[in-house]
Amino acid sequence: MALTSIFGGSSSSSGTPATSSPSDVKTQLKSQISQELAIANATELVNKVTENCFEKCLNAPYAASQDNCVDQCLAKYMRSWNAISKAYINRIQQASVNGEI
């Protein structure tokens, strides 16, 4: 993505000035940052789950009984992830209401 599109400009070189207000630009930037953080967090979760659960549960030679260990490990990670995410979102919302961000 070109920086000009982030700041309200077009990627073409038509030379027309950007018509976005500063608040629109700020909103667009916040939205883009939020999306990028969500992707980074999801990627980190997948990497940690893969690293920890598969290392803990899967041994050579593979046995079908190891599936249960992986399932339980994944479920535990997802429960923890959801609890942490809810707490984080609540803190961000509270900070926003208080004008801290």
From Swiss-Prot:
GO cellular component: mitochondrial inner membrane
Compartments reported by the entry: Mitochondrion inner membrane
Entry superkingdom: Eukaryota
Subunit: Heterohexamer; composed of 3 copies of TIM8 and 3 copies of TIM13, named soluble 70 kDa complex. Associates with the TIM22 complex, whose core is composed of TIM22 and TIM54. Interacts with the transmembrane regions of multi-pass transmembrane proteins in transit.
Family named by the database record: Belongs to the small Tim family.
Domains (record comment): The twin CX3C motif contains 4 conserved Cys residues that form 2 disulfide bonds in the mitochondrial intermembrane space. However, during the transit of TIM13 from cytoplasm into mitochondrion, the Cys residues probably coordinate zinc, thereby preventing folding and allowing its transfer across mitochondrial outer membrane.
Name of protein: Mitochondrial import inner membrane translocase subunit TIM13
Source lineage: Eukaryota, Fungi, Dikarya, Ascomycota, Saccharomycotina
Gene name tied to this protein: TIM13
